[in-house]
């Protein structure tokens, strides 16, 4: 790949980043605690923690603390699928039902009749794995979609946070390929991977991704050794105050949900980011071929736009969008910003987020990536997201200097 090797003023960035983290955990609108890191191709160049693991608790936040990483799980599932493509086992453009038969039974919901019953029809096609990876498969989330929310409230459709097989079995919202809509697509990619490997997704990750990356502290199971370092998920109340939620994802889960189910540390995620910065190579071996990385990170969405995420369930998400007014696309694992972002992130960089206000970016042009981790609901928390944007901006300011 063509790269520009920029020089980071590490001292200036460390000073600015430490200040931003300290500000984030101070004042009435504070976050309880935050961990943030930046890596270059070789090592973590900034690692910071501020605040507390749980509001009112005595444990300070540390860089070794464990987070529910929510949708930052998705890119790891995409990586497992890309390995199958390399091996000639997965055809991205074949119906996903070839590998995960249950997806072929799902119908399209067109709304509700006068009696409140779902109006269903057969889809024009079964989603392909490529469509699932690019969020054009037809799925949504109940916290971002009114129809799914109504199915949950009136018909008892289980939430994905139950980690149950029943939670996967939602109708499609539209015919595959029609538009981009963020949803449970990557959970189905996980089912494709399991169908081809004959193993649970967590086992596939451990053997084929975590081992060559040297990742030990990441799992779909909330291990006992994680509990002593587990960061509490908090709710941001309407008045801006915070309440510990006591929320945990089911462990062990009935299904390893490839869209959101991992627990892990930010330091371990740095190893995953470094793999993308190094054309597929981890510290213990190759995860993806360089040509696979290049193929995967192109725009696979065509002219379809990535749109704002509407906060349908206010306790889970605000209206949220990266870089409003700017064009965004989707690669196979990530969102692509098509224009230079206000933070300084260059056009063509990759990134995404997790529901509890976790955010990351991967800038292969300059050879850096970063991750900002908090545990707050709803998504799009004004303090966490704003401070993340300041953190990323401070990085690019120090890179230019």
Swiss-Prot record:
- State the top-level EC class: hydrolase
Q: Which reaction does it catalyse?
A: methyl acetate + H2O = methanol + acetate + H(+)
EC numbers listed for it are: 3.1.1.114
Q: What does this protein do?
A: Plays an important role in the metabolism of acetone derived from propane oxidation. Catalyzes the hydrolysis of methyl acetate to acetate and methanol.
Name the family the entry cites.
Belongs to the class-A beta-lactamase family.
For molecular function, the Gene Ontology terms on record are: hydrolase activity
Q: Does the keyword Hydrolase apply?
A: yes
Q: What positions does UniProt annotate as the active site of this protein?
A: 71 (nucleophile), 74 (proton acceptor), 182 (proton acceptor)
Induction or repression = Induced by propane, 2-propanol and acetone.
**Source organism's superkingdom?**
Bacteria
Protein name per Swiss-Prot or TrEMBL: Methyl acetate hydrolase
- This chain's source organism reads Gordonia sp. (strain TY-5)
Q: Which UniProt keywords apply?
A: Hydrolase
């Amino acid at each position: 790949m063509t790269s520009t090797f920029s020089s980071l003023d590490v001292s200036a960035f460390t000073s600015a980043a430490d200040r931003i983290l300290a500000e984030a955990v101070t004042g009435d609108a504070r976050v309880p605690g935050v961990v943030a890191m930046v890596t270059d191709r070789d090592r973590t160049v900034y690692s910071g923690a501020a605040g507390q693991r749980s509001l009112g608790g005595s444990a300070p936040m540390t860089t070794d603390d464990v987070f529910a990483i929510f949708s930052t799980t998705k890119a790891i599932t995409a990586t497992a699928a890309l390995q199958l493509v390399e091996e000639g086992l997965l055809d991205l453009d074949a119906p996903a039902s070839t590998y995960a038969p249950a997806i072929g039974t799902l119908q399209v919901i067109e709304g509700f009749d006068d009696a409140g019953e779902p109006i269903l029809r057969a889809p024009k096609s079964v989603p392909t794995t490529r469509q699932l990876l690019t969020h054009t498969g037809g799925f949504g989330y109940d916290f971002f979609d009114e129809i799914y929310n109504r199915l949950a409230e009136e018909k008892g459709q289980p939430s994905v946070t139950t980690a149950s097989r029943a939670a996967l079995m939602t109708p499609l919202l539209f015919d595959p390929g029609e538009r981009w809509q963020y949803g449970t697509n990557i959970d189905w990619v996980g089912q494709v991977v399991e169908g081809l490997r004959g193993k649970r997704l967590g086992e596939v990750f451990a053997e084929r991704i975590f081992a060559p990356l040297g990742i030990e502290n990441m799992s779909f199971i909330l291990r006992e050794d994680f509990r002593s370092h587990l960061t509490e998920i908090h709710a941001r109340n309407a008045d801006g105050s915070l309440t510990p939620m006591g929320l945990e994802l089911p462990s062990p889960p009935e299904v390893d949900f490839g869209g959101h189910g991992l627990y892990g540390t930010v330091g371990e995620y740095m190893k995953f980011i470094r793999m993308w910065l190094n054309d597929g190579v981890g510290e213990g071996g190759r995860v993806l071929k360089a040509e696979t990385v290049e193929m995967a990170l192109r725009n696979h969405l065509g002219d379809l736009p990535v749109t704002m995420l509407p906060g349908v369930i206010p306790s889970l998400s605000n209206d949220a969008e990266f870089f409003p007014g700017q064009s965004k696309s989707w690669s196979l694992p990530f969102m692509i910003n098509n224009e230079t972002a206000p933070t300084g992130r260059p056009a063509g960089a990759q990134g995404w987020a997790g529901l509890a206000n976790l955010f990351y970016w991967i800038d292969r042009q300059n050879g850096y990536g970063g991750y900002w981790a908090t545990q707050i609901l709803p998504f799009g928390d004004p303090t966490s997201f704003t401070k993340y944007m300041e953190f990323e901006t401070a990085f690019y300011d120090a890179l230019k200097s």
